[in-house]
């Protein structure tokens, strides 16, 4: 998928189609990349089902989607602050940066409260759009949701895929894609 290609996956669109439709893996491609694509596809399927139901955003919903995104590629991390499992959607208990020596994201201790705030903010705007649909406002909400979630960076891995998934979730919910 394009979302995993941004993350560095070398699996092409045609190879993904064969993987999704026929269960045929791409010769010479890393298994982790193929698993990443299968997991993301399942996350999109769950997300679209919830979008059709107009399910309210919650931290548990986000963690559940993250668990699907990271199901086969996540890991257990043991840190001084505790243990967490990215394949279960657990929030990070460590600091993270954008690449080696890159920008630091917010302190992990702030993440739970920021995610609650994020969900309340998104739900308030979603509810307004459900009452008075406006395609421009729906697009803006989806872009804002992507930007806010990737800025919070709640997980140790999969933040980009999750942020794009949530952006697409909102676009799907409001009939834009």
Language model: regions and residue ranges:
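FIC/Doc superfamily catalytic core
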Residues: 1-177
């Amino acid at each position: 998928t394009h979302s995993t290609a941004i993350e560095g996956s070398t699996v092409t669109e045609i190879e993904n189609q064969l993987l999704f439709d026929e269960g045929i893996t791409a010769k010479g491609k890393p298994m982790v990349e193929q698993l990443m694509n299968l997991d993301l596809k399942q996350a999109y399927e769950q997300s679209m089902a919830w979008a059709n139901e107009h399910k309210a955003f919650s931290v548990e919903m986000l963690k559940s989607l993250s668990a699907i995104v990271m199901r086969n590629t996540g890991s257990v991390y043991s840190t001084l602050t505790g243990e967490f499992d990215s394949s279960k959607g657990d929030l990070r208990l460590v600091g993270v940066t954008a690449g080696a020596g890159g920008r630091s994201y917010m302190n992990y201790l702030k993440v739970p409260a920021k995610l609650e705030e994020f969900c309340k903010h998104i739900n308030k705007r979603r509810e307004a759009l459900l009452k008075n649909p406006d395609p421009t406002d729906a697009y803006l909400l989806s872009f804002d949701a992507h930007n806010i979630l990737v800025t919070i960076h709640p997980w140790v891995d999969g933040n980009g895929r999750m942020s794009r998934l949530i952006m697409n979730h909102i676009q799907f919910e409001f009939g834009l894609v």
